[in-house]
Amino acid sequence: IDREPQPTPKNVQRMQYLLDHDIYDLPNELRPTCQQGAHSYKSMYGRLKWEEPAQTITSGFGSIGQGRYMHPDRTRALTAHEAARIQGFPDYFDFSPCPTRSALATMIGNAVPPQLGAAVITAFLELSARSDETLRVDESQSA
């Protein structure tokens, strides 16, 4: 889970350029030819910022070509552990059922952040309890 993804030599050059120039978005001319020109997704090949929230984690977090998944100050993409932390998984969470790095990336990238899931469930239960109480009051008034 803490193993660093192995970037291509070209992606190492791209990441080094971002660090050397202290920028977060790769200039258009340094992108692969197929991604140059008018594009709306400038965070591809982007670098995370310590002082800003991370973008949505997807199963592609191991490659900087999939989004803004470059470590803020290292020449590498996020590790699975770092991506899991961004998603809100506690460090003690057991990812051992994932037999491959790809399965691990899919599990982390497709997950609903645990804190968000807990908030949604709590809100649903509170709303459900209020609805039940309203139904009981309505039934007692109609009797």
Listing of model-derived features with the role each one plays in the protein:
Residues 1-143:
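C-terminal target-recognition/interaction regions appended to catalytic cores
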